[in-house]
């Protein structure tokens, strides 16, 4: 029998504190109300900041095994049900509706945060029009990545055979094929009955705006997740063995929000469709627990990325982003401890959404710092503890500056001048 404990908090009590690492459990509110807040709230919570019976507290930090992302205070006397991390697989088996409520709430939150990040960092709304597939094809054609262009043109034509750009897409598709570039049907339309899929390097798994009915688990190799914005490719993440992706389209039956392309090496994936997923909920609770952890990891990282958008100085943004990546990978900083990131300075600048006109100077400053070594496709930090300390120092200075601004804003004035 699943043994859950009840915890009481008096009105005004702190239940969670942002930044603390007490994340071995999460709570379900049984009675009462709880207010949540963040030090840097870039976007309002979709469900609001006042939680009540049936809502969850601390579930993202718990499932991601990362520090708390918010502070929670009891607005009234509250009774909470405590669920330990190790109990989650059993919760899936014994109380599937609660587990699925968490998964679907995570999926909705991810899409909401993804839309917010796109608006803030890329200065535009998420593309949902199928014609964006044609735009993606045009981009990869210009980049001479012909197989990727073929994939995008093919799926545009499949969805919009008589669309605005159909004739051009058809001509482009045939012209590329006439040069000898191969587009085997098993790559354009994988056999959905085959759960294990093997892709060669630089292959398209799915395209932004494409409809999707599967999530994927990487069994071997790496996958790059990106978007095409203003005729340039924005790298969102590099996923590795054991990682999952594509879950939002499966859970919400909505178009893909990003593009997935295999890295340079061969990649093997396990594809899970909706029917398999529904079976796995009851037969493989450990796998569903992993999916929940994956979603929690992504949401935690999105909140961190949103906070990163508020940092005004490019080099400080770059340090903060590297520290986020270390925490994502659960790498404990250490004096003289070296770490290699598998992306270069230009990709880091893209991840930080540094304006194009500032990128060259930001990279030059970044490379001048003593703990940084770099190649085109990797960054080596020679002392991760120093990186962590420098990031913390930058944050402290930002908080002090913010407090000064707030103080000046609150000063009494007489005809526009401070009263001393």
List where the protein language model places each region:
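Conserved phosphate/pyrophosphate-binding and hydrolysis machinery centered on Walker-type P-loop NTPases
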Residues: 22, 123, 308-312, 338, ...
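Phosphate-/nucleic-acid-contacting segments
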Residues: 129-176, 321, 325-420
């Amino acid at each position: 029998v699943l043994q859950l404990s009840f915890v009481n908090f008096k009105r005004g009590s702190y239940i969670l504190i942002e930044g603390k690492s007490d994340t071995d459990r999460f709570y379900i509110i049984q009675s009462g109300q709880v207010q949540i807040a963040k030090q840097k709230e870039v976007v309002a919570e979709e469900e609001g900041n006042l939680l009540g019976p049936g809502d969850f507290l601390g579930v993202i930090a718990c499932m991601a095994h990362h520090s708390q992302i918010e502070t929670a205070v009891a607005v009234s006397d509250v009774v909470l049900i405590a669920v330990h991390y190790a109990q989650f697989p059993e919760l899936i088996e014994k109380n599937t509706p609660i587990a699925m409520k968490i998964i679907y709430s995570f999926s909705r939150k991810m899409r909401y945060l993804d839309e917010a990040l796109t608006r803030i960092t890329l200065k535009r709304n998420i593309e949902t029009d199928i014609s964006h597939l044609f735009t993606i094809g045009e981009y990869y054609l210009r980049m001479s990545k012909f197989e990727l262009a073929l994939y995008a043109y093919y799926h545009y034509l499949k969805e919009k055979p008589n669309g605005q750009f159909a004739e051009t897409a058809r001509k482009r598709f045939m012209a590329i094929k006439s040069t000898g570039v191969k587009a085997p049907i098993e790559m354009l339309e994988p056999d959905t009955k085959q759960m294990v899929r093997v892709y060669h390097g630089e292959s398209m798994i799915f395209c932004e705006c494409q409809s999707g009915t599967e999530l994927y688990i990487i069994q071997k190799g790496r996958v790059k997740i990106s978007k095409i914005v203003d005729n340039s490719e924005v790298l969102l993440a590099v996923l590795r063995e054991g990682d999952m992706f594509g879950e939002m389209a499966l859970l919400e039956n909505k178009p893909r929000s990003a593009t997935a392309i295999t890295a340079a090496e061969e990649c093997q994936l396990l594809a899970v469709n909706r029917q398999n997923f529904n079976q796995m909920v009851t037969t493989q609770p450990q796998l569903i627990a992993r999916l929940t952890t994956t979603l929690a990891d992504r949401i935690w990282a999105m909140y961190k990325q949103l906070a990163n958008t508020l940092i005004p100085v490019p080099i400080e943004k770059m340090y903060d982003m590297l520290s986020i990546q270390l925490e994502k990978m659960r790498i404990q900083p250490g004096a003289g401890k070296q770490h290699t990131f598998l992306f270069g300075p230009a990709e880091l600048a893209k991840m930080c959404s540094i304006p194009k006109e500032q990128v060259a100077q930001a990279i030059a400053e970044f490379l001048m710092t003593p703990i940084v070594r770099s190649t085109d496709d990797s960054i080596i930090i020679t002392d991760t503890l120093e990186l962590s300390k420098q990031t913390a120092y930058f944050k402290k200075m930002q908080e002090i500056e913010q407090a000064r601004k707030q103080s000046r804003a609150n000063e009494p004035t007489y005809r526009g001048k401070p009263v001393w």
